[in-house]
Amino acid sequence: MKAQARFLVLGAVLAAALSSASALPPDGAPSKEEFVPDPLLDTMQTELRRASVKLSRADPPAYFLSYSAYDGDALTMSASYGSLLSSFEGRFRHAGVIVRVGSPELDNTHGQNRRTAIVQGTLPLENDPDALARSLWWLTNRGYRSSAPAFLKVKTDTAVRSEEEDKSNDFALEPPQSHVDARVPALGLDIAEWQARLRRESAWFRQYPEVYDSEIVLQDQTSGFRFTSTEGSRIAEPNHLVRLVIEAMTRADDGMEMIRVETYQAPQPADLPSEAVIHFAIEKMAADLQALRAAPVAEPFAGPALLSGRAAAVFFHEVVGHRLEGHRQRDEEEGQTFTKKVGQQVMPAFLSIVDDPTLSALAGEKLSGSYKFDDEGQPAARVQLVQDGVLRSFLMSRMPIKGFSQSNGHGRAQPGLMTTGRQGNLIVTSTNTVKESELRERLIDEAKKQGKPYGLYFEDVQGGFTLTQRGLPQAFQVLPVIVWRVYSDGRPDELVRGVDIVGTPLAALNRILVTGDTMHVFNGICGAESGSVPVSAAAPAMLFSEIEVQKREHSHERPPLLPAPGFEGREKAAGAGKPQGGSR
């Protein structure tokens, strides 16, 4: 059994058979929709029709094919301490071909064989129909040669293995979709202007000798997603995402490495924060790192804790979100924490959860997990996962599970990987709220009630991960970066370092006492079996009766022996005035 962690960081079927002439109308367009020409999509659909006729008559027959393509431009530039490190701009076209052999009831993706259905490759950058068709033809040939023997193996394994508990089909039949917006947006930024800006912004770290490494990275990517299938879907949708990532690192005297990361994401470069905002963020990052170097190492602890909204959002992404992904309810290697709890209370009744990829912004922030169509060509949809503490649904791709036979628009994947049910915009709401400013006093009251000398306040996090497979502990780990001891006797709050939140889901969820009244958003990149996809999680701050923390593993490499260039002779003066731990 392979161990697999899901992590979060700050940073589709033919109705009957392919031989049916009605699967694709003669002109290649979905019925009852106006045909919108697009050279790449048109070539994909023409070659798909040709392949479907042949492969539907093969032995064993292919009953479903789909082509997807990602066509766009990407620009990445980075700078450190006032100088450019890199600047790359390029065009790309990637294709994914899915070939399903057998029938919707049983096909080559059954069990642990999902990856056999997809092959990936590059496409010509120019709209030459012959060159594009040739590439798609070769990928389709590879796809069938992978899928056909996999299906024969599935049939053999099914015959000799014990009966499965979930006897759902392997693929959900869905109506065809049509939406063609063939624009591929321009990158839309002035390269020279942004190179100069990154030089200026990265130079601000020069004044902080205890920041040992820092970098600012700008990523601007535009793409046009195209999708067509033998069921008649025809989709083209543009996308534009810009990310500005600021990273800074230092090391304590005991060798512990501390990293601060700030990530800003937007649909356009103009929507990124101003230089003044970035300057303030860098000053705070440097101050945080300086304070963390001097902060004491936290000890293992179990007691009351307050999670900021961002920390609570990551907590729910890891603890709940991954465990509500549909395929995990069917995979017998998974822990299936919530599989048989539909209709049961799984968390306090004042909490509800939806996943809504149709929402583009929340609480004044753009959401990274937004999309119109998922990677299986299904329209995005709002899904009520938990209502008043009661589990209602799962995040579904086109892989059915017991009790949930259709997709709800959450089939997502990194290009070239097989889709699974994934999170988009996970939103946690509460009906048991107090003003956010009151939560600290509530934390102190809870610590006094339990006879604890302090509670913990988790101000910011950098991400987390979770283990979901049986045979492994059904545990999660959230990685905080700014953590405070909030003393119950009135002493100032004390900054600590080297601490991770750990626990198991069912126990942790039922220790939430009350929440704040303000929503906070965490945008990040989530990695799992179907690759890395952009996601958002939103939640209010939350007070827990008990959170368990453990010491974080760290290296024992010493800080640099030499002072930073330009700071020779200043180390004594700097040492005399440096903070002996953070307090507030």
Locate the predicted segments by residue.
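Active-site bordering "gate/hinge" segments
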Residues: A5, A23-F373, Q378, Q387-V390, ...
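Bacterial N-terminal signal peptides
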Residues: L8-S19
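Short linear motifs in exposed loops
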Residues: P238, L395, L495-R497
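Residue-level structural signal for beta-strand termini and adjacent loop
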Residues: V261-T263, S397-M399, R497-V499
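Hydrophobic alpha-helical bundle architecture
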Residues: G369, T429-A507, N523-S530, P534
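Short loop/turn microsegments at loop-to-beta-strand junctions
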Residues: P379-A381, V481-I482
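Conserved catalytic-core segments centered on acid/base and nucleophilic motifs
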Residues: V383-Q387, F394
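C-terminal, non-catalytic macromolecule-binding modules
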Residues: R392-E446
